[in-house]
Amino acid sequence: MRTATLYRYSVPMEAGVILRHQRLKSRDGLLVKLQQGELSGWGEIAPLPEFSQETLDQAQVAAECWLQHWVSGVESDDSVLPSVAFGLSCAQAELKQTLPLSADYRKAPLCTGDPDELFAVLQALPGEKVAKVKVGLYEAVRDGMIVNVLLEALPDLTLRLDANRSWSRAKADGFAKYVNPALRSRIAFLEEPCKTRAESREFARDTGIAIAWDESVREADFQVEAEPGVAAIVIKPTLVGSLARCQQLVQQAHQAGLVAVISSSIESSLGLTQLARLAAWLTPATVPGLDTLDLMQAQVVRPWPDSPLPLITTEQLGVVWHR
């Protein structure tokens, strides 16, 4: 016999979490639990405002429709809504025990630009010293100076940068101007520096700073292929879709000689632990981009190892659907 439950969570965020144009005050999402006999599986459905094509309410309607079929014994195709497809495919994979349990809890720490603070964090990191810096929120020149300071201060540091398509070509050049050419090879990649792919390609060609595709991966005309200056693709499963789709993208990236990075869309601790398992399975040689839990004030159902944040249990969540 099959049963399914859909829970809704809302976790307060730390002050100062800004998406593209708005402050994120709480992270809201759905958790799905599938039960079949003695086996169960969980998944998270949490569209990210400003980044997901669907709203949480739309995701809930689609999830309820899929679950109604599932409890009746009907196997439906993946939802066309990426967050729903991802959450339901995780729940199914756990139920069928096809999502490996081993996890990669390494994370590229999100860095605010203070070298002393980052130095302390990196000293405690095992192995590869990789950190991520969000650029494009302030002046491009300031970003360039900060990146340069970090690379100079920490000789074994590699940086991943993310601009979210926020720069014109002129601003991107302003950033590059302040990064010493001798240090640029330690920028693993800069995600989508410019507003268009063509400008980003030209930027990589002219500056020698490698780029990665992020937003582009979710666009209908995108194809994974080797290109000069392109080092990686960033895969955010909540925005991309099912586990099968993520697996396909990773395989295509590796065939093209590109790095594939599994990355967070600010999921709860439950979703993050599943992303850590996905990364250990599909991209074991690459540090995933999962350092977002500390943006929240609580964990949900499943804890992240060694996190001091309080844990919200299943009993504390609201049930929005059950059959």
From Swiss-Prot:
It comes from Yersinia pseudotuberculosis serotype O:3 (strain YPIII). Its EC number is 4.2.1.113. Pathway: Quinol/quinone metabolism; 1,4-dihydroxy-2-naphthoate biosynthesis; 1,4-dihydroxy-2-naphthoate from chorismate: step 4/7; Quinol/quinone metabolism; menaquinone biosynthesis. The lineage of its organism: Bacteria, Pseudomonadati, Pseudomonadota, Gammaproteobacteria, Enterobacterales. Converts 2-succinyl-6-hydroxy-2,4-cyclohexadiene-1-carboxylate (SHCHC) to 2-succinylbenzoate (OSB). It catalyses: (1R,6R)-6-hydroxy-2-succinyl-cyclohexa-2,4-diene-1-carboxylate = 2-succinylbenzoate + H2O. Pfam families: MenC_N, MR_MLE_C. This is o-succinylbenzoate synthase. NCBIfam families: menC_gam_Gplu, PRK05105.1.
